[in-house]
């Protein structure tokens, strides 16, 4: 019987240290992403693709910070206002998901990834 109680105590102790998956709540569909941007004036649209990719076409008013810059990417992020809302995208959604994770680790609280990236973007783009 004591083994049963010990198992319950260990299980509950382990649950204390579990954190919800923050990334699952930061991935937004194109529709929700666009709607949320409108609801947050002053929000920043962040393109984490390379400069060449950015110049080939990007979402209007997007700021380009290349995720592949490594430490330079972190430096540029640290120069941003961590209290703003950030809507992040890349080509397909993979790099932007990584960027959102990095941003949250750096203390940004409102960061959102565009599912499918610019490949699935149906809105306007500029070159």
Locate predicted features:
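Short, surface-exposed ligand- or partner-binding patches at beta-edge/loop junctions that are enriched
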Residues: 89
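Structural scaffold elements adjacent to functional motifs in cytosolic proteins
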Residues: 45-47
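Rhodanese-like catalytic fold shared by cysteine-dependent sulfurtransferases
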Residues: 2-6, 12-43, 52-85, 94-127
């Amino acid at each position: 019987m004591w083994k049963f109680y010990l198992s319950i105590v260990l299980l509950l102790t382990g649950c204390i240290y579990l954190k919800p998956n923050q990334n699952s709540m930061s991935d937004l569909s194109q529709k929700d992403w666009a709607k949320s941007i409108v609801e947050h004036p002053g929000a920043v649209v962040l393109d984490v693709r390379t400069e060449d990719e950015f110049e080939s076409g990007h979402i209007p008013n997007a700021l380009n910070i290349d995720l592949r810059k490594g430490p330079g990417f972190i430096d540029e992020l640290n120069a941003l206002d961590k209290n703003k809302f950030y809507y992040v995208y890349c080509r397909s959604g993979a790099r932007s998901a990584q960027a959102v994770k990095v941003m949250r680790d750096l203390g940004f609280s409102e960061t959102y990834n565009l599912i499918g990236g610019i490949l699935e973007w149906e809105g306007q783009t500029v070159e």
